[in-house]
Amino acid sequence: MTKYIFDATSFSSFSKNEPKQIIILCHGYGGDGQDISALALNWRRFLPDAVFLCPNAPEVCTVNPSGYQWFDMTVENDETILEKSLVAEKKLNTFLDQVLDDFQLDITNLALVGFSQGSMMIIQTALKKKEQINCLVAYSGKIINKKHLSENIVSRPKIFLMHGDKDTIISPSHLLESKEFLVQQSLKIKTKLFKNCEHKISVEGSSLGLEFLRKNIL
């Protein structure tokens, strides 16, 4: 197995067969791959020929040194945030290419899942990637920089955006803003707003995410 650019929590195919799909799950700010791997554990038997990889983001988190960040979110300057996100995007792209090469699978067999800052990363990375990823499931996220993304979109994978209506970390208003923006860019977008749900992945959200993956990648 290739030595990846990121440390990752990983799960081989539930069927023990040669993998036919790859699901990469990107955690939120201050979390790690182990955190989001709970989704992989819940989904594995329903995607039996998929391998799951849950990488740790490249930087130690500024506000939670026991966790990781894709980029520093304590700064409030949009240009600085974009600049830092582009550094992380380059690294995530390297990781995706390493994994695809390792398993000798086409990018059409790759799906990305993200939570919070991880969602921000997968949207920006996937839409700018020349080869089109199969689909994205993005929980509780937003678009990092609409102007930058609108000028650099080259891929249009199917995307499922989900958010809790009681989210105080990333406002649920970003769900509709992101949908409106992405539809304007000719992407197929599915959305779900959960009632009485805070900044987390609900049980229903997990089930709907799995259903979306099964529909698109199997």
Language-model-detected regions and their locations in the chain:
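Serine-hydrolase catalytic machinery in alpha/beta-hydrolase-like enzymes
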Residues: T2-L105, N109
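A conserved short beta-strand
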Residues: E131-I143
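Conserved alpha/beta-hydrolase "nucleophile elbow" surrounding the catalytic nucleophile
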Residues: H27-Y29, V113-F115, G164
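Active-site signature of alpha/beta-hydrolase-fold catalytic machinery across serine-
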Residues: A38, Q124-K128
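Short beta-strand/loop motif that positions the catalytic acidic residue
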Residues: L161-H163, D167
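Gly/Ala-rich beta-loop-alpha elbow adjacent to hydrolase catalytic centers
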Residues: G114-G118, I122
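Short alpha-helix in the alpha/beta-hydrolase fold that links the catalytic acid
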Residues: S37-A40, S171-F181
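C-terminal catalytic histidine-bearing segment of alpha/beta-hydrolase fold enzymes
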Residues: F160, L176-L218
